[in-house]
Amino acid sequence: MVSSRRGFNPIAFTPWPVTILTSLVYLALIIPIIVVHHLVPPAPKQSPPGVDLEEAWHDLQHLTRQYHPYNSHSNDEVHQWLLKRIRAISATTSARSESQGGPEVFVFDDNQTNLTFSSAGVAATAITGVYFESKNIVVYIRGTEDEPGEWWKSPDGEPSGKGGVLVNAHYDSVSTGYGATDNGVGVITTLQLLKYFTTPGHYPRKGLVLLFNNGEEDFLNGAYAYSQHPMSKFTHTFLNLEGAGAGGRAVLFRSTDTEITRFYGKSQHPFGTVLARDAFKLGFIRSETDYHVFDGVFGMRGLDVAFMEPRSRYHTDQDDARHTSIDSVWHMLSAAITTTEGLVSYTGNEFDGDSGEGGKLNNGVGTLGVWFDFFGSSLAVFQLNTLFGLSVALLVVAPLLLILTSVALFAVDKMYMFSMYTYLSESGGQVSLYGLRGMFRFPLILGISTALTVALAFLIMKVNPFIIYSSPYAVWSMMLSTCMFFAWFISCVADFARPSALHRAYAFSWMFGILWVFLVIATVYQRQHGIASSYFIVFYFAGVSVATWISYLELFGLSTTQDYARRQSRLSDRTPSSDSHLLAPSADELPSSGSVAGRDFNPEDVEDEEPTESTSLLRGQQRTTFANYASARGSQESNISNQGSSLLHPKNNRLEQKWSIYLVSSAWILQFLLVAPIVLILLGQLGLFLTSATYQIGADGGSQFIIYIGIAVLSVLILLPLFPFIHRFTYHIPTFMLFVLIGTLVYNLTAFPFSHNSRLKVAFVQEMDLGTGKNQASLVGVEPYIRDIVHAIPFVNDEEISCTSKGYGGRTKCSWPGLRPTVVDGPYKDWVTYNISQTKEDKTTRFEVSGKNTRACKLLFDSPISDFHVHGSVVDKRIPHTGSKGVSEVRLWSRNWENTWTVDVEWTKKSAERTGRVMCLWSDDNDLNLIPELDMIRKFAPWWVAITKLRDGLVEGSYSFKL
């Protein structure tokens, strides 16, 4: 007797190898992707030369002791502390410079620059005008190849030589956050860059400008003001350090071009994908960073590196040093050192080219890029043109290759796919090939599993739409398990009813066709809109194309359809009875050692072998119940595992098409490895990145349905590489996925959506009508939770609460009479003083505005004005301060407290009623009882609530006017 285990094939297309190998590959890739996404690489135990991590951490703790928005006294304290730290580092450098020839360091405390510009609005609406006075700190480290002299002291001075490098970080925080990651880590990183590039061995070849800008949180004011500083003429490239989350890894948000991105790609732990840049470009991400000014206004070339999650801590009291880590500091710092070092050491002329339009700098022209990281350890960077060329090549070559292969198969008479019958050339008799069996199985499996997965998105949105806010992985698990289980279940039912050896080939063919259409759309967007996020489709399609081609190549190993028809005809002639199917051998009867009774094995001999009294009467008969499927299939695999030839198709040739006995049993593993790994790496990263960027936008009024649909679609795309093989899975993993589905579905439908680590953000503002004494405190948040929060505040009567959702972008504003704030000593009517006067021609109105204990006021107009001018202000033709639809609001910022602004306003001809409000703002909440209503909310609001600011001021005091 021949051993039953002889010739076992561990990669045969049988249930256990398929289940185990595919599961191992998925786990081996998904687990590292999740780990890399959430765990920050550890900081070195000993600080590298040129930096001091312990010092950096102490600086971060000092910087984040208080809220320090621009309109606060603590902001002045931070400003003075930064100057002290910068000068201390510079003094060490100066002493070293005298003895070792170190670089010169120049510190500019910018207390003179101002600018009038517009900060928001589009052509179809009135815009917001801004007047801002700078409190920026600019540090220039002269490069070893920079021209000597102090050209900036001359009013018309211009830099010579190659352009320098700018590193920017804003040091103001919001009024409700300590600013540890937004943007304390960026500030501390910039301080350490000053130390690093003034340390021997690290001196920059090109000049380095470090900008500590103030006023970013109030619509990028500090970056706009930098446009008026002399150093803005010198810097051609930039690195912007920012924070839109609270901890984790620093992400490459955006980059202007391929060439600049390559410098970041050399960092030790690059992290990011071009998807973020495209999201900004398409308007899916509306918040902006200083990158917008440096790129869009100045025409500089550079990068935007920022923290991105969790957004529930962003702009709240949990954006503090306790909720970040030295590892996060090092991740940003190490990337900044590598990127900046590459830029200041670059000697080419790539960033010194022709002048841009609109007075932009001479920065040359870059190429749009594509980038994505691999497990946070390397960065793939290439041009969008390369991606476009590859896309076009695949769109043409891949279908052509399949067509030529199909023609060749027809030519050699081996095209079993798409063929129901063949005809004997001798007699013209018809022989069934069953080549269409399983042809429409894949769209059925894909359609039903996708529909059920998407249906869950609708269900969650209907019952518990905010569950993703705190439990994104519960949502992912639910979607993945739904798709996985139902795809397997439908596949098994179809395979039980109509087994087909062509399931793999047809599945890949359908995938090929669907992805080809997706690639056409992606290619159009690449060319016409510069959208590069479709890179995963290109690689997905490439893998599927080769896998599909392999399925076609497998058919060359079969006999011709004519030879098969002749054998079947001879068999039919010898056994004309209705029981002729008994002549088909069972799996046990196939030889295990390549021979039968001492002679060479030939499948034709087996087919012609007569049944005997010892032949099983049940072999080859169709299964009749699904209950018998598992045992029949398990017995079948057990028998097949004992066969001697690894090239024979593993299933009983009666259960699938008889000609399939010659199909290569191991080809499936090559197909799987061509598709699954690259899909998991690219889509896994994209899925987690999208989740991190969007899963908490619901608190800001964003559509959560898009998030659920996105996860559902990504779940299908991630599992799609399994679909050609999933009918071979054992029941164990799908059954486990069913339990996961049930558990996560119940949890997602019933669990409370917020937690201590994922608090719901609501925005606060208190509005004082100084003319009438009306005092309204307000919270803005999402329904129905905003009403529960307001009702939890003591001394607020239900009949006094008024709520409206108009004009708040999916959120609701609930207001009630609040406790009087004490942001100013004295009667509230004295908080704001103003005077309005008309010119003789009645074309211009002059406003004189001042507020006590503040340096921020604004003018609001019920009808847009055509123009305005702030006395003593500078205007820049690169940055228009008015628009075709006029100006509806003028914001006034001063570096001095209780300043008086003089503003001349020109009215449009349509301004029949000249009405509006004169308003001043107060943003300092570092002491108790300054804003007692806010103190009350913080004390009595539910534990799952976080307070953030609604607008620039926590308290707004205003007078109405009518001319």
Swiss-Prot record:
Residues 569-618 are annotated as: Disordered. The keyword Endoplasmic reticulum does not apply. Residues 1-15, 413-441, 495-504, 557-668, 727-732 are cytoplasmic. One of its GO terms (biological process) is proteolysis. It comes from Arthroderma gypseum (strain ATCC MYA-4604 / CBS 118893) (Microsporum gypseum). Pfam families: Peptidase_M28, PFF1_C, PFF1_TM. The active site is at E216. Zn(2+) 1 binds at H170, D182, E242. InterPro entries: Fxna-like_M28_dom, M28_fam, Peptidase_M28, PFF1_C, PFF1_TM. One of its GO terms (cellular component) is vacuolar membrane. CDD domains: M28_Fxna_like. This is Vacuolar membrane protease. Its cofactor is Zn(2+). Residues 37-391, 463-473, 526-535, 690-705, 754-963 are vacuolar. May be involved in vacuolar sorting and osmoregulation. One of its GO terms (molecular function) is metal ion binding. Glycans are attached at N111, N114, N835. Disulfide bonds: none annotated. SUPFAM superfamilies: Zn-dependent exopeptidases. The chain crosses the membrane at residues 16-36, 392-412, 442-462, 474-494, 505-525, 536-556, 669-689, 706-726, 733-753. Belongs to the peptidase M28 family. Its EC number is 3.4.-.-. It is found in: Vacuole membrane. It is a multi-pass membrane protein. It is an enzyme of class 3 (hydrolase). The record marks Y314 as: Transition state stabilizer.
